[in-house]
């Protein structure tokens, strides 16, 4: 409870997985009936909630859809990965023993802290037994959970997300999802939704099979995506008299460019409406293959130069509040 100065009478509703420093989500929202949802990322886990089937390997895919032959691996692959993991456990990393985000192995100095070495090797053992063999059910990873009151997953197959929002008119739940090398997404969360990770990122014509125990969770293409990731973060609906021109439009923020985007919804509020011909496919595509530039975003761009935006929200006063981690500032946009 908020007493006007600080929070009191705190109550633990749910412990969320956060074994790693990245890809653990954390955004929360309450719907029009007061049900509270939270989103988690993959937390560097690979299992049924990341759409791995019994015949699959636990390999992280970067984009698109892979063939069965590309997915399958044998015991030699498993042992090779495990030995590689143990080898780098004796090197110093700022991330983790698998080396994500680190320089080449030979360029890293030896780890001098024995406790770090033990922790690194324990992670390798965990990967060996759980990731490679048990097809572990990494509970509450890559999902949208119903927190209060407790309920089943609203969605599975989410790589990572910094944004949840509820349409004030329809009550529909929306999220943002961060791609790897390709495709940041905006998704409408249908009941028992499968967002596709780690088999699919971005729109596709290829169907995927939901994992055992989650057959009722169905995949649908994103409502909008960026082929070149923008570091998509928060989203909120403009339920404010100050923004009459954009009343009930969806606003979305990013961290790579410091941009805020605006999206007009159709009559059913299940899709977006665009005037630009090149946005009719619901994708901001690359200008050309292997380019580092996206198509023009002029139609959907609302504001820019906000730094690394971690959150946006329309407040009770009708203003749009923008949290910029890079600037260390909360901006207020009003008319």
Residue ranges and their predicted role:
Residues 25, 33-35, 41-299, 307, ...:
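Beta-propeller domain segments
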Residues 1-30:
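Asp-box/WD-like beta-propeller blade repeats and closely related beta-sheet repeat scaffolds
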Residues 12, 28, 36, 260, ...:
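Hydrophobic beta-strand residues in large extracellular and virion-surface proteins
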């Amino acid at each position: 409870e908020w007493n006007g100065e600080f929070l009191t009478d705190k109550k633990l509703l749910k412990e969320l997985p956060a074994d790693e420093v990245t890809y653990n989500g954390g955004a929360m929202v309450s719907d029009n009936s007061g049900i509270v949802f939270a989103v988690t990322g993959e937390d560097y886990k690979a299992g049924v909630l990341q759409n791995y089937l019994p015949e699959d390997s636990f390999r992280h895919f970067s984009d698109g859809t892979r063939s069965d032959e590309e997915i399958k691996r044998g015991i030699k692959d498993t042992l090779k990965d495990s030995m590689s993991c143990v080898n780098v456990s004796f090197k110093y990393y700022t991330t983790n023993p698998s080396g994500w985000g680190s320089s080449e192995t030979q360029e890293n100095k030896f780890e001098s802290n024995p406790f770090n070495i033990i922790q690194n090797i324990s992670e390798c053992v965990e990967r060996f037994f759980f990731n490679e063999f048990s097809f572990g059910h990494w509970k509450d990873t890559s999902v949208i959970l119903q927190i209060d009151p407790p309920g089943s997953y609203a969605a599975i197959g989410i790589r990572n997300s910094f944004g949840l929002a509820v349409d004030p008119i329809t009550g529909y739940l929306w999220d943002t999802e961060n791609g790897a090398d390709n495709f940041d997404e905006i998704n409408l969360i249908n009941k028992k939704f499968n967002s596709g990770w780690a088999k699919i990122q971005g729109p596709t014509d290829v169907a995927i099979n939901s994992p055992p125990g989650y057959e009722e969770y169905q995949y649908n293409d994103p409502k909008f995506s960026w082929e070149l990731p923008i570091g998509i973060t928060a989203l909120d609906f403009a339920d404010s008299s100050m923004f009459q021109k954009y009343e009930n439009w969806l606003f979305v923020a990013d961290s790579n460019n410091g941009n805020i985007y605006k999206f007009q919804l159709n009559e059913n509020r299940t899709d977006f409406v665009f005037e630009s011909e090149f946005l009719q496919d619901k994708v901001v595509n690359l200008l050309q293959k292997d380019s580092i530039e996206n198509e023009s975003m002029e139609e959907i761009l609302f504001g820019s130069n906000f730094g690394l935006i971690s959150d946006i929200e329309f407040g009770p006063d009708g203003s749009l509040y923008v949290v910029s981690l890079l600037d260390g500032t909360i901006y207020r946009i009003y008319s």
